[in-house]
Amino acid sequence: MEVRNNNKVNLCFSFDNLRNELSRPYGILFINNKIFLEFISKSIQRGSRIITVGDYVSRVLEENGIVPFLEVIDGKTKRTITQNRAITRNKEYKVTNEAGKIRFEIFEIMENILKDREGGVVFVDGEEDLLVIPVTLSANHGDIVIYGQPNAGAVVIIVNEMIRWRVRDILEKAIVKEC
């Protein structure tokens, strides 16, 4: 086990063994943008915070006048570099996360960011896809977590104890490896 000089353990959860399970949507799959945007607008009116994981879903909301409380992006859509963002935020964070993994430290980072009342943008050097897991575990009850389902639409997770249980179940099946 490698310990960095900043006293953080260099371990990751690896999900290679869970590709099939993770390819299914873990929330409500919206295939119609109009219905999706109406749902998000009503959720905001009810006081839910909107958290996006992925460049495409973040951009769709922004283009429709909805600025998420927190965006987790890596600058790519389907592994292709996306255009620069039009909206800047007061708080911007940078993290590193390898494809197909979640670094242990990301859980604490997301928890701290989601405690902040201002939200912001998390720029991921690497890949953000699996960061739905720590975001969902750290989000408040009733928060809305959105991620893209490639070639299908947007998946909306309404955070509650049942979904946290499902996410913990996935996490327990992951393999711990050195990053």
UniProtKB/Swiss-Prot annotation:
Catalyzed chemical reaction(s): 3'-dephospho-CoA + GTP = GDP + CoA + H(+)
Any one Gene Ontology molecular-function term assigned to this protein's record: GTP binding
UniProt key word Nucleotide-binding: yes
A UniProt-annotated Pfam family: DUF359
Enzyme Commission number: 2.7.1.237
GO annotation (BP), single: coenzyme A biosynthetic process
InterPro entries attached to this UniProt entry: GTP-dep_dephospho-CoA_kin (IPR007164)
Source superkingdom: Archaea
Annotated pathway: Cofactor biosynthesis; coenzyme A biosynthesis
Binding site for GTP: 55, 57, 74, 76, 128
Keywords, ordered alphabetically: Coenzyme A biosynthesis, GTP-binding, Kinase, Nucleotide-binding, Transferase
Keyword Transferase annotated: yes
Sequence similarity: Belongs to the GTP-dependent DPCK family.
Function in brief: Catalyzes the GTP-dependent phosphorylation of the 3'-hydroxyl group of dephosphocoenzyme A to form coenzyme A (CoA).
Name of this chain's protein: GTP-dependent dephospho-CoA kinase
